[in-house]
């Protein structure tokens, strides 16, 4: 069973309080999501493999550490996942970015795929699927299904907030996927919105309704 990591870092929790706040405007909301995305990526990549390399400083030669093993790819779920991407790239500028487009059927609440664009060597990379919210779990499950069908094996999921129902369903559907969350909220309401949540992340990021 994949592990669930809930971050308690003070900076993440501080910024998340403003992301949740209904009075936070679009510009500040975008900036905060971007910043938290970067901070979360720092934690998500904590266990990447390192190798010894010989370098020369201005003073002497030494053995230093550099990343080795599988390369990274981040896959935001459109459209809201895009809001976390720039912060991630600030931290990991060489990472590849794929995209999975999904929308939620308002009646069935099931995720419907409409777009997929991934790096050609996706099966050789460590994948981090990115979406601000894990509500019912349907979008995350379908996105990971799509990645696995195309050969991806090493997959993690990263989100700002999650409902317990979504975490449970994602774990049941993909036992091999670790889940990284800035905050685990109370529940889903009758309309499948996370409570207390932050509203519709996509609408708040892009100024739409």
Swiss-Prot record:
Q: Which GO terms describe its biological process?
A: UMP salvage; uracil salvage
Which Gene3D superfamilies did the record assign?
A: 3.40.50.2020
The known regulators of its activity are described as:
Allosterically activated by GTP.
Recorded E.C. number(s)?
2.4.2.9
Cofactor annotation: Mg(2+)
What note does UniProt attach to the cofactor annotation? Binds 1 Mg(2+) ion per subunit. The magnesium is bound as Mg-PRPP.
KW Magnesium (keyword) present: yes
| A Pfam family matched in the record | UPRTase
- Give the record's keywords alphabetically: Allosteric enzyme, Glycosyltransferase, GTP-binding, Magnesium, Nucleotide-binding, Transferase
User: What residues does 5-phospho-alpha-D-ribose 1-diphosphate bind to?
Assistant: 79, 104, 131-139, 200
As its record notes, the protein acts as a catalyst of: UMP + diphosphate = 5-phospho-alpha-D-ribose 1-diphosphate + uracil
Give the record's pathway.
Pyrimidine metabolism; UMP biosynthesis via salvage pathway; UMP from uracil: step 1/1
Any one Gene Ontology molecular-function term assigned to this protein's record: uracil phosphoribosyltransferase activity
| Chain residues that bind uracil | 194, 199-201
- According to its UniProt record, this protein's enzyme class is transferase
The free-text function statement in the UniProt record for this protein reads:
Catalyzes the conversion of uracil and 5-phospho-alpha-D-ribose 1-diphosphate (PRPP) to UMP and diphosphate.
Similarity annotation: Belongs to the UPRTase family.
Q: Which HAMAP family match?
A: Upp_B (MF_01218_B)
Please identify the protein, giving its name as recorded.
Uracil phosphoribosyltransferase
Species of origin reads Staphylococcus saprophyticus subsp. saprophyticus (strain ATCC 15305 / DSM 20229 / NCIMB 8711 / NCTC 7292 / S-41)
Gene name in the database record? upp
């Amino acid at each position: 069973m994949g592990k669930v990591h809930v971050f308690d870092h003070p900076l993440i929790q501080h910024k998340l309080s403003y992301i949740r706040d209904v009075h936070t405007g679009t510009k500040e909301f975008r900036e905060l999501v971007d910043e938290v995305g970067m901070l979360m990526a720092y934690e998500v990549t904590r266990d990447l493999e390192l190798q010894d390399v010989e370098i020369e400083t201005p003073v002497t030669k030494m053995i230093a550490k550099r990343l080795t093993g599988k390369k990274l790819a981040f896959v935001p779920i459109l459209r809201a996942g895009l809001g976390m991407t720039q912060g991630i790239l600030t931290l990991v500028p060489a990472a590849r970015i794929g995209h999975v487009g999904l929308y939620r059927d308002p009646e069935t609440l099931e995720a419907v795929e409409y777009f997929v664009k991934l790096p050609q060597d996706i099966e050789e990379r460590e994948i981090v699927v990115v979406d601000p919210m894990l509500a019912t779990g349907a979008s995350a499950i379908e996105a990971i299904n799509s990645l696995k069908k195309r050969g991806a094996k090493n997959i993690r999921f990263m989100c700002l907030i999650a409902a317990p129902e979504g975490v449970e369903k994602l774990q049941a559907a993909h036992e091999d996927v670790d889940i990284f969350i800035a905050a685990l909220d109370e529940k889903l309401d009758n309309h499948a919105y996370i409570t207390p949540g932050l509203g519709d992340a996509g609408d708040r990021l892009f100024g739409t309704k």
